[in-house]
Design a protein with these regions (language model features):
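Transmembrane beta-barrel domains of bacterial outer-membrane proteins
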Residues: 1-112, 116-141, 158-194
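Intrinsically disordered, low-complexity, charge-dense segments enriched in Lys/Arg
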Residues: 151-157
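Outer-membrane beta-barrel signature, preferentially recognizing the C-terminal barrel domain
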Residues: 139-150
Length: 194
């Protein structure tokens, strides 16, 4: 809607304009409205711990996110990570530790991740562990729980088309009351506007 566009233009200008503080430039805010003006929003920030500049070869960082989505409700993610850039700047590697919380159902999980990025290719692996027990959805029959599992993904863009990316992801989720869910996803992402 027009109101939504005006609000987001103002937010973007304040967060990323010439007078914005460095921490604001590492923060992304999104806002949309559903029917009856019900908001969908997200705030995500990535902040270095300690000194970090263009000459730095490694960085410890925190990453926080708060979002409200139509299908999951309000969620928050809090994490810490490390990245090391090699001397010739052509690749980096790192790891992270996160806690995710979904307020609907009061569910929580921990995750540990590793990544290796070289040029146009990237490999990422994440392991997930539920830290909340089963919860009743309706007080009687339907139960819900956080599944343990992992995802492993390799993706690449193209030298002359950085706006296009293809990826392959393997996953396995351990389900409590049925067979484990596992598979392979192959997909593409296209950034059609800059």
């Amino acid at each position: 809607s027009a109101l939504q566009a005006v609000v987001m233009t103002g937010v973007h200008s304040a967060m990323h304009g010439s007078k914005a503080k460095p921490w604001m430039q590492r923060t992304v805010v999104s806002l949309r409205f559903q029917k009856n003006w019900k908001p969908l929003y997200g705030v995500e920030t990535l902040q270095p711990l300690g000194h970090y500049d263009e000459a730095s070869r490694h960085v410890w960082f925190t990453q926080e996110r708060l979002a409200n989505a139509a299908d999951t409700g309000t969620t928050t993610n809090v994490g810490v990570g490390y990245r090391r850039i090699v001397a010739n700047d052509d690749h980096y590697y790192g790891g992270n530790l996160f806690y995710d919380h979904r307020f609907r159902g009061n569910h929580g999980r921990m995750s540990v991740g590793l990544e290796y990025v070289s040029g146009i290719g990237a490999f990422r692996m994440n392991w997930y562990r539920g830290v909340s027990g089963e919860r009743s959805l309706d007080g009687v029959m339907r139960l819900e729980s956080v599944s343990n599992g992992y995802t492993a993904e390799y993706g690449t863009s193209f030298k002359n088309a950085r706006w296009a990316r293809v990826y392959m992801e393997a996953y396995r989720w351990q389900l409590r009351r049925s067979e484990d869910k596992h598979g392979l996803r192959i997909g593409t992402e296209l950034q059609l506007t800059p």
